[in-house]
Structures are given as structure tokens and as C-alpha cells.
Amino acid sequence: MDLKEAFATIFDQNRKVALYAAGTTVAVLGLGLVFKYMRREEKLTRVGVVTKLLVHPLKSGKAVSVEAAECLRMGLKYGELRDRHWLVITEDGHMVTGRQQPRLVLVSLTCEGGHVSLNGPQMEELKFPLNNSSDLVVDCRVFSVDVQGRDCGDKVSEWLTRFLEADKPVRLVHYEPDLKPQRPHEKEPLFPKDDEVAYPDAAPVMLMTEASVGDLNSRLDKDLSVFQFRPSIVVSDCEAFTEDTWDHIRIGEVELKRVIGCGRCLFTTVDPETGVFSRKEPLETLKTYRMTDPKQKTSPILGQYYTVRKTGVLHVGEPVYKITY
């Protein structure tokens, strides 16, 4: 091969490389443009501000009000406390809630330094280890759904049975990560198939607004607090019942997706300060104007259930943004 042919060969090879590179660049740019125009542009609208974060470690127990909490796929977490990760059950594993034992709302469960503390009016404080692998794992039933929990021992059982003045012994179980959870999708197909919760009625997060409770109070003889309705997140600086329209929201780095309205039951008639049933209000009044979700049949709606799309830390005082496209 002479010099002329060698240069011709090199030129031809370089031209092919250049054409290939140019083609690749055009393809990448083209895909970028397609992605840009196919991607929905996100719009954030401020709709309120977080005024309360409430963790309910014990299902039907007293709320723990915190200034900040982790928002995980299974709900709120504050230190060693996780939302609705403790459950009172009968000896055969069926759940016991404030619907059957209204005095449960007076029981405080806290946790520090690897030990759990139970407190209640006119009761001595009871402490026990958070993790005790020697305790049995038991099968439980929450609204006819099979779940599991680790039994917290006989002393805890005796304390709760005595405080509740129960006819038969009750026991306390604790949900641990390797145990069988609830899958909300099995009860309500609108929930994501991969959602898991411990012992909540339905969802990892329930949000409501102070204005909605204020609207209800304007129709009652006695003002009620948000604590009567057991939300995870309370929002203010908005109009009543606007949470019904917040399909997709962002709070800080957390993203939540609305699934279904929170249908209210007889439990709302338990006074969280006294543990006494009224059996009428506020449920009867709610039924007169909040039968707004056919999916909840005969239950009036107050608050909304959310699934956690993106985890993070929530803070009281953070703005709430509605996401639209």
C-alpha cells in the first residue's frame, strides 16, 4: 500500500467514526427532546402548613405529639416509637381497640433507651424491654386480616387487664420488621400492592385539617380537638375539607398520595380525655353532611388516607404543597 492509499484508508475510517459519533449525538439529543416533551411538568401550589405531627405507638392509645418525625413507608417514626406498632389482643389473638375498651385511649406508651413504659391514670408505671427475642411470636387478627406480633409478656398482660377492668385477660404484642404485616391492597384495591402496615385500620398516614374540625365544632354543642380523630398529620392555614382534593402532596422531602377518605365510626364518640363513650356525637352530626365518599358506604368522611410515595423527615411548621401536572 502506497502513501496515497494509506491516507485514503485513514480518511475513510475517520469519516465513519465521525458519522457514527454524529448519529449518536443526534439520537441522544432526539431522545432528550422526546423526554422533555413527554415528561409532565410539575407544579407546586402551597395549600397549608403542618401544625401537628402525632404518633400513636399503641393502637387506640394516647398520641405522642412531636415537632419532627420520620415519614416511612409504614408510617411515622419518632426515635424508637413507630406509629401503631403495638396492639392489644385477646388471648386468642383478636385485636382489642377503643371500640371495645374505650379506656385504652388513656394508656400512654413511650420508649427510651431500649425500654418501653406504660402509664395510665391511677396506675403504677410499668417498664419492659423493647426487644426480647425469648417472647413468643403470635398470630393476630386485625379486621379479619392475619398479622403477627411478638408477645410482650405476662406482667404487661396483667397491667393492661387490670387497667381496662377486662372480663378476660388481654395481651400486648409488638410488630417487628421480620413479622407478617397487613397489606392494605387486600382490603382496598386502591392501595398500592406493595404497601405494608403494622396495625393501623387502613393506611400508613392519615391527614386532616384544623379547619375541618373547626367546621364540625361549629355544628356541635361542645368543641372537640383533633386528638379525638387520631390523625398522623394536622394541617392549618386552609379551608375546611380542602384535604379532600389534595391527591398528591409534598411536605419537605416527603411525597404523599391520597388513596381514600377516612370513614368514621363509633370510636369518634370516645372522649380522649376521659375514655368515656357518648355513642352519639360527633358521629351523628358528621352523618348529616359528610357522606361524601361512596367507597366508604355508610361512614362519614373526616380526613384522608395517604400512601407514602417518597420518605423523609417531617417538621411542624413546614408548608404543604399540592402537586399538579
From Swiss-Prot:
Cofactor binding remark: Binds 1 Mo-molybdopterin (Mo-MPT) cofactor per subunit.
Cytoplasmic side: 37-325
Mitochondrial matrix side, ranges: 1-16
SUPFAM superfamilies reported for this sequence: MOSC N-terminal domain-like (SSF141673), PK beta-barrel domain-like (SSF50800)
Subcellular location: Mitochondrion outer membrane; Membrane
Record-linked Pfam families: MOSC, MOSC_N
Residues annotated as signal peptide: none
EC id: 1.7.-.-
Biological process per Gene Ontology, one example term: nitrate metabolic process
Residues covered by region (MOSC N-terminal region): 85-175
Domain of life: Eukaryota
Annotated binding of Mo-molybdopterin, by residue: 59-60, 84, 230, 264-265, 305
Membrane topology: Single-pass type II membrane protein; Lipid-anchor
InterPro entries recorded: MoCF_Sase_C, MOCOS_middle, Pyrv_Knase-like_insert_dom_sf
GO molecular function, one term: pyridoxal phosphate binding
Cofactor(s) required for function per UniProt: Mo-molybdopterin
Description of its domains: Comprises two structural domains, the molybdenum cofactor/Moco sulfurase C-terminal (MOSC) domain and the MOSC N-terminal region, forming a cleft that accommodates Moco. The MOSC domain, which contains a large seven-stranded mostly antiparallel beta-barrel, engages multiple interactions with Moco both pterin ring and phosphate group, allowing for a tight coordination of Moco within the core of the enzyme.
Described purpose of this protein according to its UniProt entry: Catalyzes the reduction of N-oxygenated molecules, acting as a counterpart of cytochrome P450 and flavin-containing monooxygenases in metabolic cycles. As a component of prodrug-converting system, reduces a multitude of N-hydroxylated prodrugs particularly amidoximes, leading to increased drug bioavailability. May be involved in mitochondrial N(omega)-hydroxy-L-arginine (NOHA) reduction, regulating endogenous nitric oxide levels and biosynthesis.
Name the record gives this protein: Mitochondrial amidoxime-reducing component 1
Organism of derivation: Danio rerio (Zebrafish)
Gene: mtarc1
